[in-house]
Amino acid sequence: QKCATIVMVTNLLEAKKLKCHQYWPGEDTNEGETEKYGYFLVTLTDVKTRNFFVTRTFNFNNSTTLPSIIRQLHYTAWPDFGVPKNPHELLLFRRRVIAANPPHSGPIVV
């Protein structure tokens, strides 16, 4: 599908309960380390932490397709319950998502 951008707007835990499974190499993984998920090899190549979101860059590879670079933008300021009180950060995050998605790439996965 030529997806180049994944957006995540939930945290892994909500009220200390698992809400989302981590589908990328862990934060304790050193950049450049690779983990296998089914047929896919995922290498974490870059992590940038900002006030209210994290940008992770991965190389995805399997034996049947060319390697691809995928960027994940993870909004980390969503409250456990309800919605953000101030939309400013969320709107800024949306702008960052749009800017991060390369031209002529496939759909953004949310």
Curated annotation (Swiss-Prot):
GO molecular function terms attached to this record: protein tyrosine phosphatase activity
Keyword Ligase tagged? no
Keyword annotations from UniProtKB, A to Z: Hydrolase, Protein phosphatase
Pfam families associated with the record: Y_phosphatase
What family does the Swiss-Prot or TrEMBL record give for this protein? Belongs to the protein-tyrosine phosphatase family.
Answer yes or no on keyword Hydrolase.
yes
Which CDD domains does the entry mention?
A: PTPc
Query: What does the record give as the reaction this protein catalyses?
Result: O-phospho-L-tyrosyl-[protein] + H2O = L-tyrosyl-[protein] + phosphate
State which Enzyme Commission number(s) the record gives.
3.1.3.48
Q: What is this protein called?
A: Tyrosine-protein phosphatase 3
Annotated residues for binding of substrate? 80
State the remark under miscellaneous.
STY 3 and STY 6 may represent a double domain transmembrane protein tyrosine phosphatase.
Q: Which residues form the Tyrosine-protein phosphatase domain?
A: 1-110
Which of the seven top EC classes does this enzyme belong to?
A: hydrolase
Q: Which gene encodes it?
A: STY-3
Q: What is the lineage of its organism?
A: Eukaryota, Metazoa, Chordata, Tunicata, Ascidiacea
